[in-house]
């Protein structure tokens, strides 16, 4: 269990996360299949294992892992538009009258309801790790919307979840721009070979570089004309690599072979043991990595009143 993306949320108050109580709460909203006329469903699933006996909360040391699954019917907009146009044309031709917006919207709803039972179904899972001692919730997602779906559903079942996206004192873009300009990142961080540069003007240009020497004259020229770094590939120690963006989203996390080999040794022969070992090692690594990342970005910002 290695996260591929990371959105970090700060608990703004102490929350007494009790594994047994959390298990009971999550069980009140289990994931389920869409009914024939439902567009989507959302609920909690076991992060590891299958079947009714698989726990909805996986506990390892001081960490908890939960997972939510979304099931949605995929109805392409083009299919609905074509069917609606055909129906509107038919009515206007047969009844010799214009179909206006209110009726058009009603027809569209009827078409969607007729097509839903035949629509393809897509399932997606989102994992979140809770670290109560650190006051953090880490979501394996690059989309804030996807993370908020999980957090709002968690809030719904436990009653209260005082949490906010973690922010830092210095703009990540400003820090990353400085690292590329000076060709030196903070201690234990190393600039790799990929970045995105944007003009600060609203309609300004975007330059995306991959497998390129970011210390070269071409990159420095872009920076000298006012572009700033909005995404940057980095490595931390010899343990992981990732892409950081200007919204503090960590993407394309890759844990180096050394960590994966250690987890494989720790986990034994069973699949569940392997998953547990990798999750534990990942969380312990995050326990070192995240404080260093936030410090490198100017330190965590604590809003007034919190």
Swiss-Prot record:
Keywords: Cytoplasm, DNA recombination. The gene is rdgC. GO terms for biological process: DNA recombination; regulation of DNA recombination. Its main location: cytoplasm. Pfam families: RdgC (PF04381). Disulfide bonds: none annotated. May be involved in recombination. This is Recombination-associated protein RdgC. Transmembrane segments: none annotated. It is found in: Cytoplasm, Nucleoid. Belongs to the RdgC family. It comes from Pseudomonas syringae pv. syringae (strain B728a). GO terms for molecular function: double-stranded DNA binding. GO terms for cellular component: bacterial nucleoid; cytoplasm.
């Amino acid at each position: 269990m290695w996260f591929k993306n990371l959105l970090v949320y700060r608990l703004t108050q102490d929350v007494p996360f009790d594994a047994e109580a959390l298990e009971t709460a999550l069980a009140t909203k289990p994931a389920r299949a869409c009914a024939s006329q439902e567009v989507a469903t959302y609920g909690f699933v076991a992060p590891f294992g299958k079947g009714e006996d698989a726990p909805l909360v996986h506990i390892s040391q001081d960490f908890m892992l939960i997972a939510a699954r979304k099931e949605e019917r995929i109805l392409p907009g083009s299919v609905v538009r074509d069917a609606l146009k055909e129906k509107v044309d038919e009515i206007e031709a047969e009844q010799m009258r214009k179909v206006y917006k209110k009726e058009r919207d009603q027809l569209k709803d009827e078409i969607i309801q007729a097509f839903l039972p035949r629509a393809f179904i897509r399932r997606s899972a989102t994992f979140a790790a809770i670290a109560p001692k650190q006051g953090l919730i880490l979501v394996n997602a690059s989309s804030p919307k996807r993370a908020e779906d999980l957090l709002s559903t968690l809030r719904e079942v436990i009653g209260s979840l005082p949490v906010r996206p973690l922010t830092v004192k210095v703009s990540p873009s400003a820090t990353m721009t400085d690292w590329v300009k000076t060709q030196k990142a903070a201690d234990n961080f190393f600039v790799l070979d990929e970045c995105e540069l944007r003009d600060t003007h609203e309609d300004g240009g975007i330059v995306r570089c991959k497998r390129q020497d970011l210390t070269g004259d071409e990159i420095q020229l872009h920076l000298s004309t006012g572009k700033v770094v909005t995404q940057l590939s980095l490595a931390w120690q010899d343990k992981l690599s990732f892409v950081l963006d200007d919204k503090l989203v960590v993407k394309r996390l890759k844990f180096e072979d050394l960590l994966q080999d250690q987890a494989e040794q720790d986990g034994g022969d069973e699949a569940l043991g392997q998953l547990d070992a990798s999750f534990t090692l990942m969380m312990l690594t995050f326990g070192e990595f995240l404080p260093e990342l936030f410090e490198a970005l100017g330190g965590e910002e604590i809003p007034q009143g919190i």
